[in-house]
Amino acid sequence: EEVSGPSAPAIVEYLKERGVRPAMVVDEGGAVVDGVFPGVKQPIAVVGIGEKGFMNVELTARAAGGHASTPAVPSTLGMLCRAVADCEKHQFKAHLTAPVRALFQNVGPYAPFGLRLVFANLWLFGPLLPLLAGRLGGELGAMMRTTMAFTTAQGSKQINVLPTEASAGVNLRLVNLDTPESAAQHLKDVIRNDKVEVKVTYAQNASPYASAEDANWETLAKAVGDTWQGSIVSPYLMMACSDSRHFSAICRDVYKFSAMALSKEQRGLIHNNDERIPVREIAKTVEFFTRLEQSI
């Protein structure tokens, strides 16, 4: 796997120069999952029609250093910790984007009555969306808003020395209604401290959306449904990032589907210790792509 490397952009540029425009692109993304949608017992085959943007930000607090025996208040770490806590307390606003709306409309009829009523009348229950996002949490909640995850931190290298700088890294995944600029401004507005710098170190916008209504979608959805019979096939918003986004420059319908059934436990093993795929799922993956290619 190449992470943010030069290969995919180079391939796209090569095809563009030669006038090649693929009718459809299928890359890694969603899977056949269960336990994601509250109260829905059937497995759901989620196919990404778009993916979130990606953004890295470094928060840096600065103040006078010194010896730990005579500490200054507020310290750089104190200011940084307050900034992190304020950011986590003030999450981004939830949005009903096109992929999420499609997911709710497709899966909603299989949900318990209360949720079914909400998803069948999204035009009416829109104001409940922020509350719903918070209560759903996990993967569904993350699909509805820009998320932020604090992942790195650095202060003094000596326990008895006050650092003049303390920093924390935060990774954001952006829905398409948030931009790197607006997301950075949100962090600044929440932190409200000129001594804490908000520096964007890397950013890319969310991808365009593929169609979930044209002939390409119908062909893909049928191949998925015929391979994993009994599953609910639905569009969704992919929360991770992939190199397939580059192909949006030459192809409208870029779909993100890993073509295998993955339990919650198996999804948790992705990029983790003991990552693995059952052999039987590899066979289903081959079956799916064979069926898809024969139907085109």
PLM-predicted stretches and their roles:
Residues 1-46:
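Acidic/histidine-rich catalytic neighborhood of metal-dependent amide-processing enzymes
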Residues 8-15, 64, 68-93:
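A short core secondary-structure module
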Residues 20-21, 41-42, 50-56, 143-145, ...:
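Short, solvent-exposed loop/turn segments at the edges of secondary structure
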Residues 29-31, 41-56, 257-267:
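Flexible glycine/proline-rich, aromatic-decorated loop/lid segments
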Residues 33-34, 93-160, 164-165, 176, ...:
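An extended, acidic, His-containing surface patch that forms the Zn2+-binding/catalytic region
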Residues 40-43, 60-67:
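Flexible glycine/proline-enriched surface loops and loop-helix/loop-strand junctions
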Residues 61, 172-174:
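Hydrophobic beta-strand positions in extracellular immunoglobulin-like domains
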